[in-house]
């Protein structure tokens, strides 16, 4: 894991754009926000950088559209930047940044904590490797 963290830090040091799925993976058609890994938030706090919350909403094409297009539709929704709160100590700052980023991502999907947790509880806890959507 240290290798991945160092690689992310190197990208930021070069002033490049860094996109990370804080859940550690992107599962197509998974409607909930899964638990986050804390590393990206720790890095954002260390570098004093904002998090730009984004969610991908997938939906299958309606029956008419399936005639012309067989791949599911995806919509990228970008939220407001979430900036580290410099009035907090480092540990609290990381936790707060993670919480506010998660809250913004759920808002973008139209979820609250309860409905998000119900979705997580109702869905399988395993992931079967899926085929690429673009083949």
Predicted feature locations:
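Non-catalytic C-terminal accessory region of glycerolipid acyltransferases
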Residues: 3-135
């Amino acid at each position: 894991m240290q290798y991945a963290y160092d690689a992310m830090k190197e990208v930021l040091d070069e002033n490049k754009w860094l996109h990370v799925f804080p859940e550690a993976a992107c599962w197509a058609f998974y409607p909930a926000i899964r638990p986050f890994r804390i590393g990206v938030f720790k890095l954002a706090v260390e570098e004093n950088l904002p998090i730009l919350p984004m969610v991908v909403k997938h939906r299958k094409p309606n029956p008419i559209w399936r005639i012309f297009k067989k791949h599911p539709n995806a919509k990228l929704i970008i939220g407001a930047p979430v900036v580290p709160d410099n009035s907090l100590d480092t540990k609290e700052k990381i936790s707060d940044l993670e919480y506010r980023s998660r809250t913004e991502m759920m808002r973008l999907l139209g979820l609250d904590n309860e409905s998000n947790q119900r979705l997580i509880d109702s869905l399988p806890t395993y992931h079967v490797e899926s085929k690429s959507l673009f083949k």
